[in-house]
């Protein structure tokens, strides 16, 4: 499982021109799920997402997590994170989990985040989406298990 976290000032995700999820301050989580991933992987990464201290405290140090900062998490599935570009010029997506299994683990990740009290608006799984965000910092972190 690979997650790209981007600290954002505000972000939204749209499908067919309609906003389906948006946040103000918080994290945008782009989530790629592979064949070997399990509920335990999704739970561990949800815990890491919620607890990662990448928001500044009053002294300007990254000491606060998204919960402490009063932020939300915008969760967006993105199988292209599992692209294999080692051969040729066309990415291969054979490392990505099948859609049914990927959706189960995506929903598990979101559910685990929500158990922490976070608001977690989402994109629509497997839809073509337009993501808009203002990256804050910029701070972009890649989580992988």
Swiss-Prot record:
Keywords of the record: Cytoplasm, Hydrolase, RNA-binding, tRNA-binding
Q: Which GO terms describe its molecular function?
A: D-tyrosyl-tRNA(Tyr) deacylase activity; Gly-tRNA(Ala) deacylase activity; Ser(Gly)-tRNA(Ala) hydrolase activity; tRNA binding
State if Ion transport is listed as a keyword. Answer: no
Q: Name one Pfam family in it.
A: Tyr_Deacylase
Q: Which InterPro entries match?
A: Daa-tRNA_deacyls_DTD, DTD-like_sf
NCBIfam families xrefs:
D-aminoacyl-tRNA deacylase
List the protein's name: D-aminoacyl-tRNA deacylase
Q: Where is this motif: Gly-cisPro motif, important for rejection of L-amino acids?
A: 137-138
Compartments (UniProt record): Cytoplasm
Organism lineage reads as:
Bacteria, Pseudomonadati, Planctomycetota, Planctomycetia, Pirellulales
Q: Which GO terms describe its biological process?
A: D-amino acid catabolic process; tRNA metabolic process
UniProt free text on domains: A Gly-cisPro motif from one monomer fits into the active site of the other monomer to allow specific chiral rejection of L-amino acids.
EC numbers on record: 3.1.1.96
GO CC list: cytoplasm
Q: What reactions does this protein catalyze?
A: glycyl-tRNA(Ala) + H2O = tRNA(Ala) + glycine + H(+); a D-aminoacyl-tRNA + H2O = a tRNA + a D-alpha-amino acid + H(+)
- From which domain of life does this come? Bacteria
| Description of how the protein assembles with itself and partners | Homodimer.
Q: What is the protein's major site of localization?
A: cytoplasm
Q: Which family does it belong to?
A: Belongs to the DTD family.
Q: What does this protein do?
A: An aminoacyl-tRNA editing enzyme that deacylates mischarged D-aminoacyl-tRNAs. Also deacylates mischarged glycyl-tRNA(Ala), protecting cells against glycine mischarging by AlaRS. Acts via tRNA-based rather than protein-based catalysis; rejects L-amino acids rather than detecting D-amino acids in the active site. By recycling D-aminoacyl-tRNA to D-amino acids and free tRNA molecules, this enzyme counteracts the toxicity associated with the formation of D-aminoacyl-tRNA entities in vivo and helps enforce protein L-homochirality.
Enzyme kind, highest EC tier? hydrolase
């Amino acid at each position: 499982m690979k997650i790209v976290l981007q600290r954002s000032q505000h972000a939204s995700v749209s499908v067919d021109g309609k906003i389906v999820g948006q946040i103000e301050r918080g994290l945008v989580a782009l989530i790629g799920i592979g064949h070997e991933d399990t509920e335990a992987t999704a739970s561990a990464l949800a815990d890491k997402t919620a607890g990662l201290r990448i928001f500044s405290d009053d002294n300007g140090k990254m000491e606060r997590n998204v919960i402490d900062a009063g932020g939300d998490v915008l969760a967006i599935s993105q199988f292209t994170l599992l692209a294999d570009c080692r051969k040729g010029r066309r990415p291969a997506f054979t490392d990505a989990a099948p859609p049914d299994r990927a959706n189960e683990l995506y929903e598990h990740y979101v559910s685990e985040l929500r158990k922490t009290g976070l608001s977690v608006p989402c994109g629509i799984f497997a839809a073509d989406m337009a993501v808009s965000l203002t990256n804050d910092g910029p701070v972009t972190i890649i989580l992988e298990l």
